[in-house]
Amino acid sequence: MDTELLKTFLEVSRTRHFGRAAESLYLTQSAVSFRIRQLENQLGVNLFTRHRNNIRLTAAGEKLLPYAEMLMSTWQAARKEVAHTSRHNEFSIGASASLWECMLNQWLGRLYQNQDAHTGLQFEARIAQRQSLVKQLHERQLDLLITTEAPKMDEFSSQLLGYFTLALYTSAPSKLKGDLNYLRLEWGPDFQQHEAGLIGADEVPILTTSSAELAQQQIAMLNGCTWLPVSWARKKGGLHTVVDSTTLSRPLYAIWLQNSDKNALIRDLLKINVLDEVY
């Protein structure tokens, strides 16, 4: 049986709401409904009664609940033990491509330079979308997540690392927003909520990417503009701020599991300033 189906079943039974379960699992509501239907088809019974927003466990669902909890607990314990033996000297850090390119690459170098206290530690730099990395963190497949958004789940610990400044850049001086095509560089869902006010309500991006390097290279070819970290853009050279634009500050967070067996190591590594190169 697919453990993801059981995990979804447990979350729906806990929240009694498909939408809230979807939010907790970082899934769409339709994906949660599909998983529940799959599980019901495998078992040949209905697990929930649905009357508008009133979702309750059926008698079959009530019987499944303790077994599902036991199976998931056993599975998580098995994964933890196996992972512990194979990843004893490994430490995985996840972030978006733009964060790695603009600031974390330098931090990773500093981690290696300060390895005296952690000789033999092997780092893995993992690039993926935030939603995927949160899932990996929750499933103990990732040790540390660096992101621009605070955690939304109680089982995560977090540390605010500081702030960095974004500005709207293009490849030529004295340009206005109205003269340029917009290239969307992904800085998180909360940034996108304010994007229309920063660019223009009717502005549709001609390119969307999670890579700052790619966006920067495309600016000149596409007569475009995009939001880049100020310090990184200045070091790159050949970039100019759009005349009628503003700057904005973005937070940077480190997130990890509260009950991670690498808690002490994580706090040690975070003493090495992530934002030395950015303000």
Swiss-Prot record:
Keyword vocabulary terms for this entry: DNA-binding, Repressor, Transcription, Transcription regulation
Superkingdom field: Bacteria
GO molecular function terms listed in the Swiss-Prot or TrEMBL record: DNA binding; DNA-binding transcription factor activity
Keyword Ligase carried by entry: no
Span of domain HTH lysR-type: 1-58
Pfam family, one: LysR_substrate
One GO biological process term: negative regulation of DNA-templated transcription
Residues annotated to bind DNA: 18-37
Function: Negatively regulates the transcription of the flagellar master operon flhDC by binding to the upstream region of the operon.
Family in the record: Belongs to the LysR transcriptional regulatory family.
PANTHER family xrefs: HTH-TYPE TRANSCRIPTIONAL REGULATOR HDFR (PTHR30579:SF8), TRANSCRIPTIONAL REGULATOR (PTHR30579)
Protein name (Swiss-Prot/TrEMBL): HTH-type transcriptional regulator HdfR
Protein source organism: Shigella boydii serotype 18 (strain CDC 3083-94 / BS512)
The gene coding this protein: hdfR
